Amino acid sequence: MASNVTNKTDPRSMNSRVFIGNLNTLVVKKSDVEAIFSKYGKIVGCSVHKGFAFVQYVNERNARAAVAGEDGRMIAGQVLDINLAAEPKVNRGKAGVKRSAAEMYGSVTEHPSPSPLLSSSFDLDYDFQRDYYDRMYSYPARVPPPPPIARAVVPSKRQRVSGNTSRRGKSGFNSKSGQRGSSKSGKLKGDDLQAIKKELTQIKQKVDSLLENLEKIEKEQSKQAVEMKNDKSEEEQSSSSVKKDETNVKMESEGGADDSAEEGDLLDDDDNEDRGDDQLELIKDDEKEAEEGEDDRDSANGEDDS
């Protein structure tokens, strides 16, 4: 169900508001009004008063369609008097102008008319409400700008205009002012769109710069990772070469020890051989001396025998 707010005074709301007069509010309720007028567009507000009602649409096109489709329709034995709230009809709200269903369509048997007292009081109340509506929602025409001071204003005789013509001119001016207001709101919307577009462009530039910074950071990180990997491989190669050098040094030291041991063994063998030769010579000398001693003994014994 729509809200009860139908008293906004901005031009857009006024141009999209429908006034429903000569409404039998004793029978017709707010839900009935919404059901009848919702087929012309979305209803954002609906208020039902004694003898009349207001329906607030989203835009002026829906309101004009509702006025064209429902004006003069008979509901609950009464003919509706419908128009835009910003464009009141000429001579409305005057006593004796309203037409009942019996006047337009003859006697209506299925909907008996109320008692004379009730009918007269209802008409008076309706007239009062319509006059109140005229006073509340009559918008004075815009005052034109004053003429320049330098130019003299020459009074001109104008023909007197009738009240009907003035009301028509006034209503026409109101519709024109509504159109100006709508064009102004369209211009404001265009300015808002331009501002939004500018903000979006700035946001896009910021996002692009952030993306560029992220790409630079990623490149630097990948470069640092490659450098760290190269340094690590160089360290591994240097450590492996150091280990290899240490292994070679160790092997060389072990080989030198083996050579020295072999040389020592060879020297020991030479010493042993020299010692063996000396012992053999000593043995030979001893044997030679022993033989010479025996020869001396033999010679001595031979002399004794002779």
Swiss-Prot record:
Name of the gene: HNRNPC
Organism of this sequence: Homo sapiens (Human)
GO biological process, alphabetically ordered: 3'-UTR-mediated mRNA stabilization; chromatin remodeling; mRNA splicing, via spliceosome; negative regulation of telomere maintenance via telomerase; osteoblast differentiation; RNA splicing
Record-level Gene Ontology MF annotations: identical protein binding; mRNA 3'-UTR binding; N6-methyladenosine-containing RNA reader activity; nucleosomal DNA binding; poly(U) RNA binding; RNA binding; telomerase RNA binding
Residue spans of biased composition, Acidic residues class: 255-276, 288-306
Domain RRM, residue spans: 16-87
SMART domains xrefs: RRM (SM00360)
PTM sites of type N-acetylalanine: 2
Chain positions of cross-link Glycyl lysine isopeptide (Lys-Gly) (interchain with G-Cter in SUMO): 250
Major localisation: nucleus
Purpose of the protein: Binds pre-mRNA and nucleates the assembly of 40S hnRNP particles. Interacts with poly-U tracts in the 3'-UTR or 5'-UTR of mRNA and modulates the stability and the level of translation of bound mRNA molecules. Single HNRNPC tetramers bind 230-240 nucleotides. Trimers of HNRNPC tetramers bind 700 nucleotides. May play a role in the early steps of spliceosome assembly and pre-mRNA splicing.
Entry-linked CDD domains: RRM_hnRNPC
Coiled coil: 190-238
PTM-bearing positions, type N6-acetyllysine: 176
Assembly and binders: Tetramer composed of 3 copies of isoform C1 and 1 copy of isoform C2. Assembly of 3 tetramers with bound pre-mRNA gives rise to a 19S complex that interacts with HNRNPA2B1 tetramers. Component of the 40S hnRNP particle. Identified in the spliceosome C complex. Interacts with IGF2BP1. Interacts with DHX9; this interaction is direct, enhanced probably by their concomitant binding to RNA and mediates the attachment to actin filaments. Interacts with PPIA/CYPA. Interacts with YWHAE.
Sequence segments annotated as region (Disordered): 139-190, 221-306
UniProt similarity note: Belongs to the RRM HNRPC family. RALY subfamily.
Protein name in the entry: Heterogeneous nuclear ribonucleoproteins C1/C2
